[in-house]
C-alpha cells in the first residue's frame, strides 16, 4: 500500500441549453485486478452513450456530465469505510455546487453481466414513480432477460450513487448485486471477459440512453416525495414497537404525533406542487 497518493476524477460535458441543470453519468475507473466487469465495462458504456448522443445530433436541454470516478474500490487507509472516496470528494469537496443543479445521477456498475432474470434500476425513493412510468412507455429493447425490467428501491451503500445521494443528488444505478458472479468472481483476478453478455450490455445502453432523453424532456424535475414520507411513517411505527417494549412510549408519544403531522403536511404539499407543475406544463404544451 502506498500512502498519501493523489487520484483524479475525470469529467467531460455535452453542453445543454440550460447549463445550470445537469444529468450526471458516473462510473469508477479504478478496479481490483483487471476489473473487466467492475467497472471497465461501465466506463465504456458511458462513452458509448455519449458518442451515440453526439453522433445523432441531439442537442440536450440539460447539460450532460460524464464523470469517471477514482477511488471507488479503495481510497482511505486504516478504515472500515474505505470505498466510494472519489465520488464523496467529488460532491462534497470538488463540486458541492452540483447539489440542486444535478437533477439525476445515473451510476453504472457491472453493466455487461447478467444479474438474475431481469434488469433492474435501483433508485432513490423519489424517482421510483417516474421510472415506473418511463418503463411502461418503453419501445421494444434488446431481449436480454426473460422478464421485464423493473424498479427497486432504495439505493444501497455499495456504489458511488450512494455518496451522491447523501449529498442531496437524486441517484440511481443498474442493479448489480445478484447472481453467482458476486460469490465467485467479484473483486478477484477472475473478473475478466468470461461472463461478458453482449445482449445485457446492449440493453443497458438502450435503457439508459432513452432514460437520458426522457429526463431531458421534463420541464420540472419529476421527484415524488410520497414514498419517502411513507418510509418515514413506517420507520416511526417500528420505533413505536421498540419503545413499547422499552417502556418509553409515553415519553415519545407527543413528539411522534407532532412529527407525523409535519410529515403529512410535507406529503400533501409535495404532491400538490408536483401536480400543479405538471398541469401548467401540459397547458403550455397544448397551447404551443
Regions found by a protein language model. Give the residues of each.
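Structural recognition of the beta-strand scaffold that forms the well-ordered cores
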Residues: 10-13, 22-26, 65-68, 103-107, ...
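Phosphate/adenylate-binding glycine loop and adjacent helical scaffold
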Residues: 286-288
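Acidic/histidine-rich catalytic neighborhood of metal-dependent amide-processing enzymes
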Residues: 31-126
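Charged, amphipathic alpha-helical linkers/stalks
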Residues: 194-284
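Active-site-adjacent substrate-binding region
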Residues: 1, 5, 102-103, 110-230, ...
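Soluble metallo-hydrolase cores and metallopeptidase-like ectodomains found primarily
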Residues: 1-37, 47-58
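Secondary-structure transition/capping motifs at alpha-helix termini
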Residues: 17-21, 52-62, 93-101, 137-142, ...
